[in-house]
Amino acid sequence: MKKILLLAALILMSQTVVFAQKEKSVKESDVPVRYVRDFNNQAKDAQNVAWTMSEDSSAYMATFTSPDGDKQAIRFTNKTSETRYYIDEQYYPHAIKDTVASQFPKHKITEIYIRNIKGKMTYQVRAARMSGFLFWKKEKDVKQISFETNSKLIEVIDEQ
């Protein structure tokens, strides 16, 4: 029994390493000062802040918990910043779930968040086909799908 639990834990850890390669965790002290200052101005009461950096160092993101317990993130680039408001699965908009189910029947929604860039709000959906068995699950054919706030489909991008 111990061997099975150890094997399951190793498999889960290896999957975490595989999926975490696109963004790298960084210390706040390694983030450009202007991004930290902007973050502190925008999210004064943020809790559990974790910073990540994109693989090519072009973007930094602070993921945090708001005072009311919601998961949020602010992503900074040289050109702009965007705020992400993550939505719990139980609150996914029905129209978006229906569109994804009809246009991508083999895909499962893995994440939905509202993206705010300079006051323009959109829903961002990440959907993937899952393959594997039991604990050994792998995402395939990942799609980033954008919707207007009225749930109208804007675009679909295949994730690399």
Model regions and ranges:
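Bacterial Sec-dependent N-terminal signal peptides
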Residues: 1-26
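Interaction-mediating elements
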Residues: 21-160
